[in-house]
Curated annotation (Swiss-Prot):
Protein name: tRNA-splicing endonuclease
InterPro entries: tRNA_endonuc-like_dom_sf (IPR011856), tRNA_intron_Endo_cat-like_sf (IPR036167), tRNA_intron_Endonuc_cat-like (IPR006677), tRNA_intron_Endonuc_N (IPR006678), tRNA_intron_Endonuc_N_sf (IPR036740), tRNA_splic (IPR006676), tRNA_splic_arch_long (IPR023516)
Biological process according to GO: tRNA splicing, via endonucleolytic cleavage and ligation
CDD domains per the UniProt record, alphabetical: tRNA-intron_lyase_C
CC annotations in GO: cytoplasm
Annotated organism of origin: Methanococcoides burtonii (strain DSM 6242 / NBRC 107633 / OCM 468 / ACE-M)
Its biological purpose: Endonuclease that removes tRNA introns. Cleaves pre-tRNA at the 5'- and 3'-splice sites to release the intron. The products are an intron and two tRNA half-molecules bearing 2',3' cyclic phosphate and 5'-OH termini. Recognizes a pseudosymmetric substrate in which 2 bulged loops of 3 bases are separated by a stem of 4 bp.
A Pfam short name: tRNA_int_endo
Gene3D superfamilies assigned to the protein according to its UniProt record, in alphabetical order: 3.40.1350.10, 3.40.1350.150, tRNA intron endonuclease, N-terminal domain (3.40.1170.20)
Protein family: Belongs to the tRNA-intron endonuclease family. Archaeal long subfamily.
Reactions catalysed according to its record: pretRNA = a 3'-half-tRNA molecule with a 5'-OH end + a 5'-half-tRNA molecule with a 2',3'-cyclic phosphate end + an intron with a 2',3'-cyclic phosphate and a 5'-hydroxyl terminus
Protein backbone atom coordinates (compact mmCIF):
# COMPACT_ATOMS: atom_id res chain seq x y z
CA UNK A 1 0.00 0.00 0.00
CA UNK A 2 1.37 3.41 -1.01
CA UNK A 3 1.91 6.26 1.45
CA UNK A 4 3.38 9.74 1.19
CA UNK A 5 5.44 11.92 3.52
CA UNK A 6 3.68 15.24 4.19
CA UNK A 7 5.75 17.50 6.46
CA UNK A 8 6.42 15.34 9.55
CA UNK A 9 3.59 12.87 8.97
CA UNK A 10 2.85 10.07 6.51
CA UNK A 11 -0.55 9.89 4.80
CA UNK A 12 -2.04 6.62 3.56
CA UNK A 13 -5.17 6.18 1.45
CA UNK A 14 -8.56 5.64 3.12
CA UNK A 15 -8.61 1.86 2.87
CA UNK A 16 -5.65 1.83 5.29
CA UNK A 17 -8.02 2.87 8.08
CA UNK A 18 -9.60 -0.57 8.18
CA UNK A 19 -6.37 -2.50 7.72
CA UNK A 20 -4.05 -0.55 9.99
CA UNK A 21 -6.19 1.39 12.44
CA UNK A 22 -9.14 -0.92 13.02
CA UNK A 23 -6.91 -4.00 13.22
CA UNK A 24 -3.68 -2.63 14.71
CA UNK A 25 -4.47 0.86 16.01
CA UNK A 26 -1.82 2.55 13.93
CA UNK A 27 -2.22 6.25 13.17
CA UNK A 28 -5.20 8.58 13.28
CA UNK A 29 -8.14 8.36 10.87
CA UNK A 30 -8.66 11.56 8.85
CA UNK A 31 -11.19 12.51 6.17
CA UNK A 32 -8.44 12.16 3.56
CA UNK A 33 -7.11 8.83 4.83
CA UNK A 34 -4.92 7.53 7.66
CA UNK A 35 -2.31 9.82 9.18
CA UNK A 36 0.74 8.00 10.57
CA UNK A 37 3.64 9.31 12.60
CA UNK A 38 7.06 8.80 11.05
CA UNK A 39 7.76 6.10 13.62
CA UNK A 40 4.58 4.20 12.79
CA UNK A 41 5.24 4.53 9.07
CA UNK A 42 8.81 3.25 9.31
CA UNK A 43 7.65 0.31 11.42
CA UNK A 44 4.93 -0.60 8.90
CA UNK A 45 7.47 -0.25 6.08
CA UNK A 46 9.82 -2.56 7.99
CA UNK A 47 7.01 -5.11 8.13
CA UNK A 48 6.40 -4.75 4.40
CA UNK A 49 2.92 -3.27 4.85
CA UNK A 50 3.46 0.06 3.10
CA UNK A 51 5.73 1.76 0.58
CA UNK A 52 6.47 5.41 1.31
CA UNK A 53 6.91 8.08 -1.35
CA UNK A 54 8.75 11.35 -0.92
CA UNK A 55 8.93 14.01 -3.63
CA UNK A 56 7.55 11.57 -6.17
CA UNK A 57 10.01 8.78 -5.39
CA UNK A 58 9.40 5.50 -3.55
CA UNK A 59 11.98 5.30 -0.78
CA UNK A 60 14.00 2.24 0.09
CA UNK A 61 13.79 1.37 3.78
CA UNK A 62 17.24 2.82 4.51
CA UNK A 63 16.37 6.09 2.74
CA UNK A 64 13.05 6.29 4.58
CA UNK A 65 14.83 5.74 7.90
CA UNK A 66 17.38 8.46 7.13
CA UNK A 67 14.69 10.91 6.02
CA UNK A 68 12.69 10.26 9.18
CA UNK A 69 15.83 10.83 11.25
CA UNK A 70 16.25 14.23 9.59
CA UNK A 71 12.63 15.22 10.12
CA UNK A 72 12.24 14.08 13.74
CA UNK A 73 14.74 14.65 16.57
CA UNK A 74 15.84 11.46 18.36
CA UNK A 75 13.96 9.42 15.77
CA UNK A 76 16.12 6.31 15.98
CA UNK A 77 15.89 6.17 19.78
CA UNK A 78 12.12 6.42 19.73
CA UNK A 79 11.83 3.93 16.88
CA UNK A 80 13.92 1.39 18.82
CA UNK A 81 11.60 1.70 21.82
CA UNK A 82 8.42 1.71 19.72
CA UNK A 83 9.47 -1.41 17.81
CA UNK A 84 10.41 -3.19 21.03
CA UNK A 85 7.05 -2.45 22.64
CA UNK A 86 5.05 -3.40 19.55
CA UNK A 87 6.89 -6.69 19.27
CA UNK A 88 6.16 -7.41 22.93
CA UNK A 89 2.47 -7.23 22.02
CA UNK A 90 1.63 -3.77 23.34
CA UNK A 91 -0.53 -1.25 21.54
CA UNK A 92 1.45 1.99 21.39
CA UNK A 93 0.32 5.47 20.37
CA UNK A 94 1.89 8.94 20.41
CA UNK A 95 1.49 10.68 23.77
CA UNK A 96 2.20 13.92 25.60
CA UNK A 97 5.62 12.50 26.51
CA UNK A 98 6.79 10.18 23.71
CA UNK A 99 4.31 7.28 23.78
CA UNK A 100 1.30 6.06 25.66
CA UNK A 101 1.06 2.31 26.11
CA UNK A 102 -2.03 0.19 26.70
CA UNK A 103 -1.97 -2.75 29.11
CA UNK A 104 -1.94 -6.26 27.69
CA UNK A 105 -5.40 -7.28 26.57
CA UNK A 106 -6.50 -3.69 26.04
CA UNK A 107 -6.39 -1.25 23.14
CA UNK A 108 -7.76 2.15 22.11
CA UNK A 109 -11.53 2.10 22.34
CA UNK A 110 -11.54 -0.78 24.82
CA UNK A 111 -9.70 0.76 27.74
CA UNK A 112 -7.40 3.58 28.78
CA UNK A 113 -3.65 3.70 28.30
CA UNK A 114 -1.72 2.68 31.41
CA UNK A 115 1.75 4.13 30.87
CA UNK A 116 3.44 7.21 29.47
CA UNK A 117 6.87 6.43 28.02
CA UNK A 118 9.68 8.98 28.07
CA UNK A 119 12.65 8.01 25.83
CA UNK A 120 16.26 9.04 26.48
CA UNK A 121 19.73 8.11 25.27
CA UNK A 122 22.22 6.92 27.87
CA UNK A 123 24.64 9.55 26.54
CA UNK A 124 22.42 12.59 26.96
CA UNK A 125 22.21 14.36 30.33
CA UNK A 126 18.64 14.40 31.63
CA UNK A 127 17.58 17.66 33.30
CA UNK A 128 15.57 17.09 36.45
CA UNK A 129 13.05 19.70 35.29
CA UNK A 130 12.34 17.65 32.14
CA UNK A 131 11.79 14.52 34.20
CA UNK A 132 9.45 16.31 36.61
CA UNK A 133 7.52 17.82 33.70
CA UNK A 134 6.95 14.37 32.22
CA UNK A 135 6.03 12.94 35.61
CA UNK A 136 3.49 15.71 36.17
CA UNK A 137 1.96 15.06 32.74
CA UNK A 138 1.52 11.38 33.64
CA UNK A 139 0.19 12.11 37.13
CA UNK A 140 -2.37 14.61 35.83
CA UNK A 141 -4.13 11.82 33.93
CA UNK A 142 -3.31 9.07 36.44
CA UNK A 143 -0.81 7.21 34.29
CA UNK A 144 2.38 5.41 35.24
CA UNK A 145 5.48 7.20 34.02
CA UNK A 146 8.10 4.96 32.46
CA UNK A 147 11.58 6.11 31.54
CA UNK A 148 13.05 4.14 28.61
CA UNK A 149 16.82 4.53 28.35
CA UNK A 150 18.51 3.29 25.17
CA UNK A 151 22.18 2.38 25.55
CA UNK A 152 24.91 2.45 22.90
CA UNK A 153 24.12 -1.13 21.83
CA UNK A 154 20.40 -0.28 21.47
CA UNK A 155 19.39 -2.28 24.53
CA UNK A 156 16.55 -0.69 26.49
CA UNK A 157 16.28 -0.40 30.25
CA UNK A 158 12.89 0.63 31.60
CA UNK A 159 12.46 2.57 34.86
CA UNK A 160 9.31 3.29 36.83
CA UNK A 161 9.22 6.90 38.05
CA UNK A 162 6.82 7.87 40.83
CA UNK A 163 6.40 9.93 43.98
CA UNK A 164 6.77 7.77 47.11
CA UNK A 165 4.67 8.05 50.23
CA UNK A 166 7.27 8.59 52.89
CA UNK A 167 5.77 8.20 56.32
CA UNK A 168 7.61 6.68 59.24
CA UNK A 169 6.46 5.25 62.53
CA UNK A 170 8.81 7.12 64.81
CA UNK A 171 6.96 9.18 67.39
CA UNK A 172 9.81 11.58 67.83
CA UNK A 173 10.12 12.84 71.40
CA UNK A 174 11.17 16.45 71.77
CA UNK A 175 13.34 15.56 74.77
CA UNK A 176 11.91 18.31 77.05
CA UNK A 177 14.32 17.36 79.83
CA UNK A 178 17.43 17.59 77.66
CA UNK A 179 19.44 20.73 77.03
CA UNK A 180 22.87 19.23 76.65
CA UNK A 181 26.20 20.87 75.85
CA UNK A 182 28.16 19.76 72.80
CA UNK A 183 31.27 20.89 70.95
CA UNK A 184 31.76 21.40 67.21
CA UNK A 185 35.18 19.86 66.63
CA UNK A 186 36.91 19.63 63.25
CA UNK A 187 34.11 18.00 61.23
CA UNK A 188 31.67 16.56 63.74
CA UNK A 189 30.02 17.29 67.07
CA UNK A 190 30.45 15.50 70.40
CA UNK A 191 27.86 15.46 73.19
CA UNK A 192 29.61 15.24 76.54
CA UNK A 193 26.78 14.42 78.94
CA UNK A 194 26.38 10.68 79.52
CA UNK A 195 22.62 10.68 80.17
CA UNK A 196 21.84 12.93 77.20
CA UNK A 197 24.08 10.84 74.96
CA UNK A 198 22.29 7.67 75.98
CA UNK A 199 18.81 9.17 75.48
CA UNK A 200 19.57 10.58 72.03
CA UNK A 201 21.12 7.35 70.79
CA UNK A 202 18.62 4.91 72.24
CA UNK A 203 15.40 6.89 71.73
CA UNK A 204 16.04 8.55 68.39
CA UNK A 205 18.99 6.64 66.92
CA UNK A 206 21.01 9.84 66.70
CA UNK A 207 24.75 9.62 66.20
CA UNK A 208 27.13 6.89 67.27
CA UNK A 209 28.67 6.40 70.72
CA UNK A 210 32.22 7.68 70.99
CA UNK A 211 32.55 5.59 74.13
CA UNK A 212 30.28 4.51 76.96
CA UNK A 213 29.68 8.11 78.09
CA UNK A 214 29.81 10.36 75.01
CA UNK A 215 28.02 10.58 71.67
CA UNK A 216 29.39 11.77 68.34
CA UNK A 217 26.93 13.35 65.89
CA UNK A 218 27.02 14.12 62.18
CA UNK A 219 26.71 17.72 61.03
CA UNK A 220 23.11 17.35 59.83
CA UNK A 221 22.05 15.62 63.06
CA UNK A 222 23.70 18.35 65.09
CA UNK A 223 22.02 21.20 63.26
CA UNK A 224 18.63 19.50 63.63
CA UNK A 225 19.04 19.05 67.38
CA UNK A 226 20.43 22.56 67.77
CA UNK A 227 17.40 23.98 65.97
CA UNK A 228 15.07 21.90 68.18
CA UNK A 229 16.69 23.34 71.29
CA UNK A 230 18.00 19.96 72.45
CA UNK A 231 21.67 20.93 72.19
CA UNK A 232 23.79 23.93 73.05
CA UNK A 233 26.74 23.84 70.67
CA UNK A 234 30.03 25.68 71.18
CA UNK A 235 33.03 25.80 68.90
CA UNK A 236 36.49 24.69 69.99
CA UNK A 237 37.15 28.16 71.39
CA UNK A 238 34.11 27.60 73.64
CA UNK A 239 32.09 30.26 71.82
CA UNK A 240 28.35 29.64 71.59
CA UNK A 241 26.97 28.95 68.11
CA UNK A 242 23.47 29.68 66.90
CA UNK A 243 21.92 27.87 63.91
CA UNK A 244 23.24 30.39 61.38
CA UNK A 245 26.80 30.29 62.71
CA UNK A 246 26.73 26.50 62.85
CA UNK A 247 25.38 26.23 59.29
CA UNK A 248 27.99 28.64 57.95
CA UNK A 249 30.84 26.67 59.48
CA UNK A 250 29.34 23.33 58.42
CA UNK A 251 28.94 24.59 54.83
CA UNK A 252 32.63 25.45 54.70
CA UNK A 253 33.41 21.85 55.61
CA UNK A 254 30.77 20.26 53.38
CA UNK A 255 29.56 22.29 50.36
CA UNK A 256 26.28 20.33 50.14
CA UNK A 257 25.51 20.80 53.82
CA UNK A 258 22.49 23.11 53.47
CA UNK A 259 20.91 20.85 50.86
CA UNK A 260 21.46 17.71 52.95
CA UNK A 261 20.34 19.45 56.13
CA UNK A 262 17.03 20.54 54.59
CA UNK A 263 16.35 16.98 53.45
CA UNK A 264 17.40 15.52 56.81
CA UNK A 265 15.00 17.83 58.66
CA UNK A 266 12.15 16.96 56.31
CA UNK A 267 12.78 13.23 56.74
CA UNK A 268 12.85 13.48 60.54
CA UNK A 269 9.65 15.51 60.45
CA UNK A 270 8.06 12.73 58.39
CA UNK A 271 8.80 10.28 61.19
CA UNK A 272 11.55 8.29 59.50
CA UNK A 273 15.15 7.81 60.62
CA UNK A 274 17.83 8.98 58.19
CA UNK A 275 21.40 7.80 58.69
CA UNK A 276 24.42 8.23 56.48
CA UNK A 277 24.29 6.40 53.16
CA UNK A 278 28.00 6.84 52.42
CA UNK A 279 28.74 3.12 52.07
CA UNK A 280 26.03 2.98 49.37
CA UNK A 281 27.21 6.12 47.58
CA UNK A 282 24.19 8.21 48.61
CA UNK A 283 23.47 10.84 51.23
CA UNK A 284 21.13 8.80 53.43
CA UNK A 285 19.83 5.34 54.16
CA UNK A 286 16.39 5.54 55.71
CA UNK A 287 14.50 3.44 58.26
CA UNK A 288 10.74 3.66 58.79
CA UNK A 289 11.23 2.88 62.47
CA UNK A 290 14.05 2.00 64.85
CA UNK A 291 12.75 0.71 68.18
CA UNK A 292 16.22 0.17 69.60
CA UNK A 293 19.81 0.46 68.34
CA UNK A 294 20.23 -3.18 69.38
CA UNK A 295 17.42 -4.19 66.98
CA UNK A 296 18.14 -2.21 63.86
CA UNK A 297 15.82 -3.29 61.02
CA UNK A 298 16.56 -3.32 57.31
CA UNK A 299 16.63 0.18 55.86
CA UNK A 300 14.08 0.62 53.09
CA UNK A 301 15.44 3.50 51.03
CA UNK A 302 18.58 5.15 49.80
CA UNK A 303 18.10 8.88 49.35
CA UNK A 304 20.28 11.31 47.47
CA UNK A 305 19.65 15.05 47.74
CA UNK A 306 19.66 17.09 44.52
CA UNK A 307 18.89 20.74 43.63
CA UNK A 308 16.19 21.71 41.14
CA UNK A 309 18.78 22.52 38.45
CA UNK A 310 20.30 19.03 38.68
CA UNK A 311 21.04 17.08 35.50
CA UNK A 312 21.15 13.31 35.73
CA UNK A 313 24.08 11.54 34.12
CA UNK A 314 22.24 8.38 33.16
CA UNK A 315 25.06 5.82 33.64
CA UNK A 316 25.55 7.23 37.17
CA UNK A 317 21.81 7.08 37.86
CA UNK A 318 21.65 3.53 36.53
CA UNK A 319 24.52 2.47 38.79
CA UNK A 320 22.84 3.99 41.86
CA UNK A 321 19.54 2.24 41.14
CA UNK A 322 21.26 -1.09 40.46
CA UNK A 323 23.13 -0.83 43.77
CA UNK A 324 19.94 0.03 45.67
CA UNK A 325 18.17 -2.97 44.15
CA UNK A 326 21.08 -5.26 44.99
CA UNK A 327 20.73 -4.43 48.69
CA UNK A 328 16.91 -4.63 48.62
CA UNK A 329 16.26 -0.90 48.81
CA UNK A 330 14.50 1.69 46.69
CA UNK A 331 16.46 4.60 45.23
CA UNK A 332 14.88 7.96 46.00
CA UNK A 333 15.96 11.43 45.00
CA UNK A 334 15.14 14.32 47.34
CA UNK A 335 14.57 17.63 45.57
CA UNK A 336 14.78 20.96 47.34
CA UNK A 337 12.01 23.23 46.01
CA UNK A 338 10.63 26.64 46.94
CA UNK A 339 7.84 24.86 48.81
CA UNK A 340 9.97 22.36 50.72
CA UNK A 341 11.31 18.95 49.76
CA UNK A 342 9.85 16.72 47.04
CA UNK A 343 10.81 13.09 46.39
CA UNK A 344 10.90 10.85 43.34
CA UNK A 345 11.36 7.09 43.38
CA UNK A 346 13.13 5.61 40.34
CA UNK A 347 13.33 1.83 40.02
CA UNK A 348 13.90 -0.73 37.30
CA UNK A 349 10.79 -2.06 35.61
CA UNK A 350 10.05 -5.23 33.69
CA UNK A 351 7.69 -4.49 30.83
Amino acid sequence: MRAEIVKDRVLVEKKAINEFYNNGYYGRPKSSGLELTLIEAVYLAFRGKIEVEHEGKVLEFSDLFKEASILQPSFELKYIVYKDLRERGFYVQPGVTDFRVYPRGSHPGKGAAKQFIYVRSERAPMPLRDLLRSLAAAENVRKQMVLAIVDEESDITFYDVKRPRLKGEMKEPLYPDINADATFLEDRVVVWDEEASKTLFENGFYGKPLDSQRLQLSLVESRYLLEKGVLNINNRQDESMDVDAFSKMASEIEPEFNLKSSVYTDLRDKGVVPKTGFKFGSHFRVYSQVESPTKIPHSEYLIHSIPMDHEFTLPVMSRAIRLANSVRKRMLYAILTDDGVDYIDIGRLKM
